[in-house]
């Protein structure tokens, strides 16, 4: 039986229950959902497994099944969820799209120019994970919980290990700047890894969100990559082709979404900070009154040029946004590589 139709049929039957049974049904569903959220990721959805590998929430109310309910093809899950919500006597809030559209806007000027300069904060741990030469432990921690029923429906690729390898260890996962700071780093002498958003280096991040972002990043990095002309082994080439084929087959991985997504510029942290420093100085030299970029902030970092203060007074208020200028030389010296990993001495 189709899952959506069966689920919808059950929810439809709740409207026929008396007040007492409807209350019991409501409490049972709420309790089941609470238990799901409270359990570990690897056991979250393991309640009752059917022979067809589906997972069910069990309640103490079993509505009588009718042939009409099981054969009606026009039932859909959206309508069913609305009926369930109404049975809970809980109003469903209607949110305005403007709240989402202007979520990142700090102020609006009289000329209706949006200022979107929110900070991007990296911690010491984020940086150390980003510069790890061996990310095996980091990847294994992610894969340990990746094969869960709740995640598989949100992941578009079949080879998650290859997807992670492309992002963190693949040929396009290193800084593409011509004069990357890693080339002159003593004992390293190679391009640094490219910089991802801070959330990509957190081990406790929601895995569905993590892999959703990862798919977009990998597709943007490798969509023009020539697999056949690379020096990779044939087995790896085959796996890469499969991953890219899976990504291209999904409608949501499209040119419009890639064009509007805040993608990594394929540069490392130090090259990004260097460009940020130059941009900040240009703002100061030209006395510009607004900025639309989001500056990188290194939490608890003391390697800043204290003689340079770049601020932006927000129109119509006494608030100011500070754009830091970092001493890249000191920051680069504080990054220490060893056999045990990476240490950033802030």
Curated annotation (Swiss-Prot):
Q: Which InterPro entries match?
A: Herpes_UL95
Q: Which Pfam family is an annotated match for this chain, by its short name?
A: Herpes_UL95
State the source organism's domain of life. Viruses
Which gene carries the instructions for this protein? U67
Q: Which organism is it from?
A: Human herpesvirus 7 (strain JI)
* Record family assignment: Belongs to the herpesviridae UL95 family.
Q: What is this protein called?
A: Protein U67
């Amino acid at each position: 039986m189709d899952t959506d139709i069966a689920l919808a049929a059950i929810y439809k039957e709740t409207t026929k229950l008396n007040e007492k049974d409807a209350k019991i049904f409501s409490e049972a569903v709420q309790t089941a959902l609470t238990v799901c959220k409270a359990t570990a990721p690897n056991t979250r959805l393991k309640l009752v497994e059917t022979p067809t590998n589906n997972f069910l929430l069990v309640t103490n109310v079993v509505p009588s099944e009718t042939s009409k309910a099981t054969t009606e093809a026009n039932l859909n899950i959206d309508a069913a969820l609305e009926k369930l919500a109404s049975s809970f006597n809980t109003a469903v809030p209607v949110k305005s799209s403007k709240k989402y559209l202007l979520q990142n806007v700090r102020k609006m000027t009289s000329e209706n120019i949006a200022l979107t300069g929110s900070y991007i904060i990296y911690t010491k741990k984020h940086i150390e994970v980003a510069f790890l030469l061996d990310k095996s432990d980091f990847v294994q921690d992610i894969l340990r919980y990746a094969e869960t029923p709740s995640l598989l429906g949100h992941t578009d690729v079949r080879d998650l290990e290859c997807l992670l390898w492309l992002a963190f260890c693949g040929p396009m996962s290193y800084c593409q700047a011509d004069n990357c700071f890693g080339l002159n780093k003593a004992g390293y002498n190679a391009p640094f890894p490219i910089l991802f958003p801070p959330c990509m280096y957190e081990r406790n991040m929601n895995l569905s969100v993590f892999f959703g972002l990862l798919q977009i990043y990998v597709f943007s990095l490798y969509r023009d990559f020539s697999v056949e002309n690379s020096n990779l082994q044939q087995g790896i080439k085959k796996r890469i082709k499969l991953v890219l084929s899976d990504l291209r087959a999904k409608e949501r991985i499209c040119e419009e979404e890639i064009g509007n997504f805040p993608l990594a510029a394929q540069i490392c942290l130090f090259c990004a900070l260097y460009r940020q420093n130059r941009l900040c100085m240009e703002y100061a030299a030209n006395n510009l009154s607004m900025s639309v970029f989001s500056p990188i902030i290194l939490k608890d970092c003391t390697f800043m040029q204290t003689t340079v203060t770049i601020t932006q007074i927000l129109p119509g208020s006494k608030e100011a946004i500070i754009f830091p200028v970092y001493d890249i030389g000191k920051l680069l010296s504080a990054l220490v590589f060893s056999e045990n990993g990476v240490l950033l001495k802030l």
